[in-house]
Amino acid sequence: MANMHQLILLRHAKAAATAAAVSDHDRPLTDAGAAAAANIGRAMRAAGLAPDVVLVSPSVRTQQTFAALEAAGVWAEWPNVEPLPALYMASPQQMRDILRGLPETVRSAMIIGHNPGLHELARKLAGTAAQHPQHVRLAESYPTATLTEFLIATPWRKIGVNAASLQRFLAAKDLA
């Protein structure tokens, strides 16, 4: 199918608790979070998940999550990486608008972002019809270092609710 696209959503790995001296934006990954991000990276590499375009929130924890994927060897060739301030705590609608702006030549895209928006976007894309175990897990929660993979059979500009087929739900805790 000519318009088939792959979308990967990844919530950043576990970050340090908010401290008085550190803004939410600047919270780094914990040691456990860095290990979880590396595990997700290895799982992505093993599954052949290497998106062409990576849209990443500029927060420290999302940037460190991306760096862990890169260090795990996810990409043989460097992807087009776009740090987007609009992804910091973005709503599902804001993320859909960003995806709608992707050119059709982009076969595979990834967003590395934050809850609650990322979880809500994943739930909206997958819809509520299917009761496959992956859908049930998606409906329940979207913990840190969780990845979902979707196939989308429409042009990027038409991405919307119930527009995707959930292919994979993978939480780092599944890999420990």
Please report, for each region that a protein language model flagged, where it lies by residue.
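Short, solvent-exposed aromatic-acidic interface loops
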Residues: 164-175
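Residue-level preference for the first positions of well-ordered beta-strands
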Residues: 7, 108-110, 147
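Active-site-proximal alpha-helix that buttresses catalytic centers in soluble enzyme cores
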Residues: 2-86, 127-131, 142, 176
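Domain-level recognition of soluble alpha/beta enzyme cores
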Residues: 126-165
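Glycine-rich phosphate-binding loop signature in dinucleotide/nucleotide-binding domains
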Residues: 47-49, 102-107
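Terminal, non-globular segments
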Residues: 36, 93-97
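A glycine-rich beta-strand to alpha-helix segment
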Residues: 106-128
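Hydrophobic packing residues within well-ordered alpha-helices of enzyme cores
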Residues: 65-69, 95, 121-122
